[in-house]
């Protein structure tokens, strides 16, 4: 375990060392900016969920980003939000990002507590994290940040590849056992506005009695002007490190601009598990809404949601939400 941790630490140090080799006595002036994001909502259920209502502070990000003109960037972000480890009304603060990124020509190297690449493209295309997480994040296929290193290279204007090596336990847990997660992705942009991506990863088990987790996903998205449409397919084997606990699902989402400050959007998710091992969580989810941009920093988004469980004895649930996003 110590050897693996030393390897990650050594790789994480590569970025500043390489960047230092490119500097000179007349280094350009650096620039910094604050990172602030607050996601909140008010919601109510209908029918059997009528008592589920109220205001929620879903998440807040506080951080700072410092960029040098030689391609070196430092970033630290704290995440304050809900956690399964505490009561629903309590919040826990985590360090989500603490990394160094170095960019040189077509190469990008990041080390530290970095953003993962498993569903970063999908999350960017969806563009409404404050309303609902992207599919893999929502259904726990992986974490959005982790401790490790990543490298991306643009071979051509329309083709790039990336690799990542992280602990595999996410940013909310400290690595205490052996096991790393390896991932690689390919991104194609053959036409203006069209993005195609394939990604696969393997997360080693920390114990011989457990199974390693394999993830792979395919994504296609098209965006031009005020219109975007995307679809993704996701598959995971040995979920929670348990043999044959496989699950998969797809997500389709679209946004249409109807003015400078208004967007209409919709999304449909489908989640299923092998041999119904996770039937209680299997089902279909749908959300439709309108996003109103109030100036540069604030978004208000009324939306309706439905969850249709796969289990025969489970009832559908309906909700109305008003989500708010404040970002700088």
Model-derived segments and spans:
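Cleavable N-terminal export/targeting peptides
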Residues: 1-27
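Outer membrane beta-barrel
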Residues: 23-45, 49-168, 178-180, 187-194, ...
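Transmembrane beta-strands of outer-membrane beta-barrel pores
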Residues: 40-46, 59-61, 78-84, 104, ...
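Transmembrane beta-barrel architecture of outer-membrane proteins
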Residues: 58, 80, 94-96, 145, ...
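Detector for outer-membrane/organellar transmembrane beta-barrel domains
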Residues: 177, 187-275
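Outer-membrane beta-barrel "beta-signal"
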Residues: 186-188, 292, 316-328
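Outer membrane beta-barrel transmembrane domains
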Residues: 251-301, 305
């Amino acid at each position: 375990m110590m050897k693996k941790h030393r390897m990650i630490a050594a790789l994480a140090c590569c970025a500043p060392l390489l960047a230092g080799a490119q500097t000179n006595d007349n280094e350009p002036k650096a620039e910094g900016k604050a990172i602030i994001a607050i996601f909140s909502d008010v919601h109510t259920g209908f029918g059997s969920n009528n008592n589920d209502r109220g205001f929620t502070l879903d998440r807040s990000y506080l951080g700072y980003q410092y960029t040098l003109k030689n391609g070196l960037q430092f970033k630290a972000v704290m995440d304050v939000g809900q956690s399964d480890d505490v009561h629903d009304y309590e919040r826990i603060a985590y360090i989500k990002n603490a990394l160094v990124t170095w960019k040189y020509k077509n190469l990008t190297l990041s080390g530290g507590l970095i953003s993962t690449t498993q569903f970063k493209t999908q999350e960017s295309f969806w563009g409404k994290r404050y309303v609902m997480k992207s599919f893999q994040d929502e259904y726990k296929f992986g974490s959005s940040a982790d401790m490790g290193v990543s490298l991306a290279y643009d071979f051509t204007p329309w083709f790039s590849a990336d690799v990542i090596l992280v602990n595999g336990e996410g940013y909310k847990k400290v690595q205490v056992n052996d096991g790393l997660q390896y991932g690689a992705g390919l991104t194609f942009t053959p036409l203006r506005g069209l993005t195609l991506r394939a990604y696969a990863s393997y997360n080693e088990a920390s114990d011989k009695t457990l199974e390693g987790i394999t993830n792979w996903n395919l994504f296609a998205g098209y965006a031009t002007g005020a219109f975007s449409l995307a679809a993704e397919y996701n598959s995971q084997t040995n979920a929670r490190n348990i043999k044959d606990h496989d699950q998969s699902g797809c997500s389709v989402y679209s946004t249409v601009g109807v003015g400078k400050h208004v967007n209409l959007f919709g999304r449909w998710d489908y989640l299923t598990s092998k041999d119904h091992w996770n039937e209680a969580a299997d089902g279909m989810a749908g959300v439709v809404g309108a996003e109103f941009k109030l100036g540069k920093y604030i978004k208000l988004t009324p939306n309706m949601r439905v969850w249709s469980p796969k289990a025969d004895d489970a009832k559908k649930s309906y909700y109305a939400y008003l989500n708010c996003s404040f970002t700088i």
